[in-house]
């Protein structure tokens, strides 16, 4: 099959629509279930590149959760501790495979954004991973293969309409890629840049120490950014992205957006949140939404009399601003990557509030000295990668 007709393009009025190979070769995919759409395939192919590179860079199984051509989360398959298992809603599942841990992390970092995601997996989808996917609201999954039982689990999702795509892991795209905008053809070389520890050698701060665990987190953040709509920054910790700021025109707005997501990830681990008692039968999405509101500024929307009874068995206490700040002050060792240079030190001021200790960015701003000085003020270690990672 060298082309596949789609229902429509980005929007229902954009017809006809298809994906195809310009050279007449076979498509490197098989649709095993469902009928993926135009945006599904954009998410799938971007996500597949991301997890393929994460696996190559770390040697660990990788997963990503994509929405509208940017990742909501990305991770490698490190084991989950009890707290992370609980906030990712997999504490009832024992001895998860590394791939399942990777997806639990990718989906769980920003559950609000990951709702209705398209999943990419670096390895053959196993039963553990399929069972996590089974109970989440998701549009589809792409992987290099599926265990027979895992495939049956996924095929049963959405009354048999769940999108399952198998991709040829050995497929290598052409070195030149093209696209059209307004009838005009753009052509460029593919971004074949390899992201590894060699990019982290130029440490420009007083603090020169970047431990191996932080190097892995920085690599995860940079590979994630390579497939995130620009401008973008990514906070990472413990083998996963914990806050991704995508598609902002202002660098500091990226840093704030991603920092707020990282804060929410950590606030969900606070005792005040872990102790919430939800009513029986509450939907996962409603539970996620309630937590998101509870840890935010509009907490009374879920604590008001006549409202909390629909969500909680027992009325929770207010999680005060002072309590939240005290909890966030414990977050440390976070890695931060950026797809382009930080123009001002205010980005580092904001990053420090979310526990950032390690930074990787291209450098090249006329105010690099100011950014370095701000990092030194907080004891951060920052590497200049000298590479830009714009993605559009």
Predicted regions and their residues:
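Glycine- and Gly-Pro-enriched alpha-helical subdomains that act as flexible
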Residues: 72-111, 242-342
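Gly-rich Lys/Arg/Thr-decorated short loops/hinges at beta-loop-alpha junctions or inter-strand turns
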Residues: 23-35, 109-115, 189-208, 285-307, ...
């Amino acid at each position: 099959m060298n082309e596949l007709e789609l229902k429509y393009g980005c929007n229902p009025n954009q017809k006809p629509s298809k994906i195809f190979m310009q050279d007449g070769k076979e498509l490197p995919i098989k649709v095993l279930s469902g009928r993926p759409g135009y945006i599904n395939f954009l998410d799938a192919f971007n996500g597949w590149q991301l997890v393929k590179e994460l696996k190559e860079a770390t040697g660990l199984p990788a997963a990503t959760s994509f929405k509208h051509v940017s990742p909501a989360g990305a991770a490698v398959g490190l084991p989950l501790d009890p707290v992370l298992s609980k906030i990712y809603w997999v504490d009832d599942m024992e001895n998860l495979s590394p791939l399942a841990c990777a997806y639990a992390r990718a989906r769980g970092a920003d559950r609000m954004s990951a709702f209705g995601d398209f999943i990419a997996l670096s390895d053959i989808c196993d039963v553990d991973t399929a069972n996590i996917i089974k109970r989440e609201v998701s549009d589809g999954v792409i992987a290099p293969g599926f265990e027979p039982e895992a495939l049956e689990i996924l095929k049963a999702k959405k009354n048999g309409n769940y999108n399952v795509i198998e991709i040829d892991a050995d497929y290598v795209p052409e070195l030149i890629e093209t696209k059209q905008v307004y009838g005009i053809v753009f052509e460029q070389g593919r971004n074949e840049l390899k992201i590894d520890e060699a990019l982290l050698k130029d440490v420009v701060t007083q603090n020169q120490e970047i431990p191996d665990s932080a190097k892995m987190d920085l690599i995860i953040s940079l590979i994630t950014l390579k497939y995130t709509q620009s401008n973008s920054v990514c906070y990472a910790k413990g083998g996963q992205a914990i806050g991704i700021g995508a598609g902002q025109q202002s660098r500091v707005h990226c840093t704030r957006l991603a920092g707020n997501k990282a804060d929410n990830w950590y606030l969900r681990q606070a005792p005040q949140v872990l102790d919430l008692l939800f009513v029986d039968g509450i939907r996962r999405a409603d539970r996620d939404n309630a937590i998101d509101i509870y840890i935010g500024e509009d907490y009374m929307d879920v604590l008001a009399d006549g409202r909390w009874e629909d969500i909680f068995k027992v009325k929770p206490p207010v999680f005060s601003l002072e309590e939240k700040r005290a909890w966030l002050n414990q977050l440390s060792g976070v890695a931060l990557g950026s797809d382009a240079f930080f123009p001002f030190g205010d980005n580092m001021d904001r990053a420090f509030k979310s526990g950032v200790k390690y930074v990787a960015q291209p450098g090249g701003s006329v105010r690099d000295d100011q950014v370095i000085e701000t990092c030194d003020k907080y004891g951060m270690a920052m590497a200049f990668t000298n590479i830009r990672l714009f993605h559009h």
